[in-house]
C-alpha cells in the first residue's frame, strides 16, 4: 500500500494476521524538499528581478504573475514525476501481485498517469484522499480491500 501527498510518500507492507486482520508495516518513507516552502524562497534571482509596474510596458504585473504560475506548474509536474518514479521503484521491488494507492484527488490522476503501465495495472484499489498523516493502525478503515468482513 502506498499513500502520498504533494510532498511525501509512505509505503506499507500489509501483513495478514489470522486473529486481528491486516496489520501495516512501514517499509519506506520519502519526502520531497521541493514541495515545501514558498516559491519566492526557491527563486534565486530575486535581487535581479525587474520591478513590476501597473502601467503599460514590458514589466507590467500580469507577465510577472504568468511567469510565477508557469514556474509553479512546472514544479508541480516535477514533484508528481518524482513521486511516480519512487512509486514505480517501490512496486517493482515488491513481489506482491497488487497494491493499493491513496493520494489527494487533485494529484491522484496525474501520478497514476505517470506510472509505467506494468505498475499501473497492478493497482487493486484507488483512494482519492490525503492519508499520509493518518496513523498506520487507522489506515485500513480507508481501504475496502483491507477491511475485515
Model-derived segments and spans:
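Terminal alpha-helical anchor/extension segments at protein ends
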Residues: 1-149
Amino acid at each position: 500500500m502506498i499513500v502520498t501527498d504533494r510532498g511525501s510518500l509512505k509505503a506499507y507492507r500489509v501483513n495478514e494476521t489470522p486473529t486481528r486482520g491486516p496489520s501495516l508495516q512501514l517499509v519506506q518513507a520519502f519526502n520531497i524538499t521541493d514541495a515545501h516552502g514558498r516559491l519566492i524562497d526557491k527563486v534565486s534571482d530575486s535581487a535581479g528581478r525587474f520591478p513590476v509596474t501597473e502601467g503599460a510596458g514590458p514589466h507590467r504585473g500580469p507577465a510577472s504573475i504568468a511567469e510565477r504560475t508557469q514556474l509553479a506548474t512546472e514544479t508541480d509536474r516535477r514533484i508528481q514525476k518524482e513521486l511516480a518514479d519512487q512509486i514505480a521503484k517501490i512496486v517493482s521491488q515488491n513481489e506482491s501481485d497488487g497494491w493499493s494507492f491513496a493520494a489527494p484527488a487533485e494529484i491522484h490522476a496525474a501520478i497514476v498517469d505517470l506510472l509505467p503501465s506494468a505498475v499501473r495495472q497492478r493497482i487493486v484499489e484507488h483512494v482519492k484522499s490525503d492519508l499520509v498523516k493518518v496513523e498506520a493502525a487507522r489506515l485500513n478503515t480507508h481501504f475496502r480491500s483491507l477491511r475485515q468482513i
